Swiss-Prot record:
Family indicated by similarity: Belongs to the pterin-4-alpha-carbinolamine dehydratase family.
UniProt xrefs under HAMAP family: Pterin_4_alpha
Protein name per its UniProtKB record: Putative pterin-4-alpha-carbinolamine dehydratase
InterPro entries reported in the protein's UniProt record: PCD_sf (IPR036428), Pterin-4-alpha-carb_dehyd (IPR050376), Pterin_deHydtase (IPR001533)
Any Gene Ontology biological process: tetrahydrobiopterin biosynthetic process
Top-rank lineage group of the source organism: Bacteria
Enzyme class: lyase
């Protein structure tokens, strides 16, 4: 099994398959702090990250944005004082793809680095 945090996104087309229920169960175990949300029939991965202040939350948001640009896969980001909500899903397929789990794991790695600098 590939470690998600070390994987990279693959190009995704509109006809790419969503993760199956079994794949979802297997992949979510690798990112246990993430929740699966269903918004208007679209499954999404979501997690809230806590920080000591707005500046640290904003720096984390910038780091996630840079990662998203590098991978060509972009989340919804909500930055507030002391917290950032990150939501991953694949817009083209209106649901979850393996890429979303990769990016969630890589987001966790960024958060660990942010904690080290706190």
């Amino acid at each position: 099994m590939t470690v998600l945090s070390q994987a990279h996104c693959e190009a995704c087309r509109a006809d790419a398959p969503k993760v199956s229920e079994q794949e979802l169960a297997d992949l979510i175990r690798q990112i246990p702090d993430w929740r699966v949300e269903n918004r208007d029939g679209i499954l999404q991965l979501e997690k809230v990250f806590a920080f000591r202040n707005f500046a640290r939350a904003l720096a984390f948001t910038d780091a996630v944005g840079a990662l998203a640009e590098a991978e060509g896969h972009h989340p919804a980001l909500l930055t507030e004082w002391g917290r950032v909500t990150v939501t991953w899903w694949t817009h083209k397929i209106r649901g979850l793809h393996r890429n979303d789990f990769i990016m969630a794991a890589r987001t966790d790695e960024l958060a660990k680095g942010a904690e080290d600098r706190a």
